[in-house]
Amino acid sequence: MLLQFRAKTFFNNIAQDSLVTLITKRVGLGYRFLSSLCQPKNTALDSEGYKILFQTAAKSGSVVLGKLAHGHMIKSSLNPCLYLLNNLLNMYCKCRELGFARQLFDRMPERNIISFNSLISGYTQMGFYEQAMELFLEAREANLKLDKFTYAGALGFCGERCDLDLGELLHGLVVVNGLSQQVFLINVLIDMYSKCGKLDQAMSLFDRCDERDQVSWNSLISGYVRVGAAEEPLNLLAKMHRDGLNLTTYALGSVLKACCINLNEGFIEKGMAIHCYTAKLGMEFDIVVRTALLDMYAKNGSLKEAIKLFSLMPSKNVVTYNAMISGFLQMDEITDEASSEAFKLFMDMQRRGLEPSPSTFSVVLKACSAAKTLEYGRQIHALICKNNFQSDEFIGSALIELYALMGSTEDGMQCFASTSKQDIASWTSMIDCHVQNEQLESAFDLFRQLFSSHIRPEEYTVSLMMSACADFAALSSGEQIQGYAIKSGIDAFTSVKTSSISMYAKSGNMPLANQVFIEVQNPDVATYSAMISSLAQHGSANEALNIFESMKTHGIKPNQQAFLGVLIACCHGGLVTQGLKYFQCMKNDYRINPNEKHFTCLVDLLGRTGRLSDAENLILSSGFQDHPVTWRALLSSCRVYKDSVIGKRVAERLMELEPEASGSYVLLHNIYNDSGVNSSAEEVRELMRDRGVKKEPALSWIVIGNQTHSFAVADLSHPSSQMIYTMLETMDNVDFVDYTLVHFCSVT
């Protein structure tokens, strides 16, 4: 009370111009002081005074000061002019109070282009691009003279939605209205074209700009990083430095991210050189640079360097903890140890009194997914609800991914429905949830709903759907999605082209898959891996190995998926020596720990060439003795070579691991049957009957239109089964005539 009394007494005795000056300097003295500032009965402010208050609140982000000043203005009975109302509107937008801003905007008796620009800018900064676009159209219909800020909001919508057609139309309007030389707008256009994957147009604008600033460079660099380019961002940073421009933390962070794209020694060395340069400039501890450095070292598997950077930081906040936790989860194959370290960091930051952010929960949920710990994930979910973050779109996406991995699509749908802002990330996660659980029709339904909700699919959504089409042999649907990708410009993204390679290869069209591979301008390790695996599956072992060697020649470091493709190629080609060599190379030269798939492939390779004992010893010496898939690969080879001795041992081990799975019993029965040991084969049948094990029928499926039809032997469950069997019976009764003879008779 004493502070409030002294403040009132003091303010009542000073002139208005001095009062405004003091207001500007004393914003941070606390809520009671602000209340005293705005409420003295004998203090009158005119429009200029209120303008200073609103501008100060906007600059400092103090919505409390802004609201107090707004309330004081209402009580003063001042009739605000349009200029003052625009300052008030701008204050609410800058303070992210868009609800108040919209109410004020709707009630303003008069509005000009500045009014529209303030709210458009507020919407775009908060990610509400559709509302910004609606305001742009409203301003145009009102015949207001649109300026660079108005167009910037609309172009931001085009970039975020990857709407190239609309973006090019707006670009044309910018040129027609004489705004094409505005550096601010050129930067926005560069950013828009970059986000739409049209780097050639972005570069053309950049080259024609006579007054490039740091934002121009940053926009182009981040654009190349976004589409997966690695060399171009480094070249641009070097040119930026040669031109005498100060390197921004944003540019350095983007280029460090580029060094992570192709995880090869050359780029990592360049990243380390940039690290040294940032240390020289004193920027090493900048949060953007530090986060990018942690990410680079973690993705390269240099967790020791990342931990060292983290431990040397003089002060740690939520962002640095998030970066370090993410570092443990960046590997191709997240180990239980890495997940455990991520959990430890999460608990450590809480012990230090740091409140987890939505980003923290997102990465911790990723650790739960990697460790497949649904129960711990549910506990984290409860903590998220306690912190009132359950409606956050990023957390919603992470929860959907967790429940998808656990096969719980219903829980995933509930998380999706409770997300406050269903953006492209949450839509993509929900689609992925259905794809992972082999619900292709539901995935397509969601993809169509995505379009009807006026949200443009991004490159990851498109590549995900194309991969799903490849897995389910739905080539027609995949080609439709690729057509959309080409039309929207998304096909320029490396991830989309990679999915195209897999889709065409799985549909049997290797020439087209190879053509797409050749067209990729900046193939990454995923692109090479897709091509290697495709060639391997088609039996082109030598070609697959040539692609692998070419990848290494281009300086791209192989990952687990690339080596898996190589081992599959060796397996299908019977190249035992090469397969063993690459397996050792993966472990010793690249320090990549083989996973279950690698061991299974090597077991299959040894088994196919009759080295059954070696294959059995390999499983026993690995850490995958309890993994049925690996044993099943060996059991299949035992049947090929009619080895009932090893086959019996392997089958008994499988029966221990999967007592209710029929496959092991059937394979062992067939081994005995093929070996002529009929009595043992009958014993296996008796064992199946005693244990109540039934053979599951094999299924085939076909996609017609957007519907998947599955069939089993003697299946009567299909709604058109009667018609199908009638047609089959009719075809059986048809006497087929030699086509050549019929054709000859018709010609003569």
From Swiss-Prot:
The gene is PCMP-E89. The lineage of its organism: Eukaryota, Viridiplantae, Streptophyta, Embryophyta, Tracheophyta. Residues 630-705 are annotated as: Type E motif. Gene3D superfamilies: Tetratricopeptide repeat domain. Keywords: Repeat. It comes from Arabidopsis thaliana (Mouse-ear cress). InterPro entries: E_motif, Pentatricopeptide_rpt, PPR_At4g14850-like_plant, TPR-like_helical_dom_sf. The keyword Repeat applies. PPR repeats lie at residues 46-80, 81-111, 112-146, 147-181, 182-212, 213-247, 248-285, 286-316, 317-356, 357-391, 392-422, 423-457, 458-492, 493-523, 524-558, 559-589, 595-629. One of its GO terms (cellular component) is mitochondrion. This is Pentatricopeptide repeat-containing protein At3g13880. One of its GO terms (biological process) is mitochondrial RNA modification. Belongs to the PPR family. PCMP-E subfamily. One of its GO terms (molecular function) is RNA binding. NCBIfam families: PPR. Residues 706-736 are annotated as: Type E(+) motif.
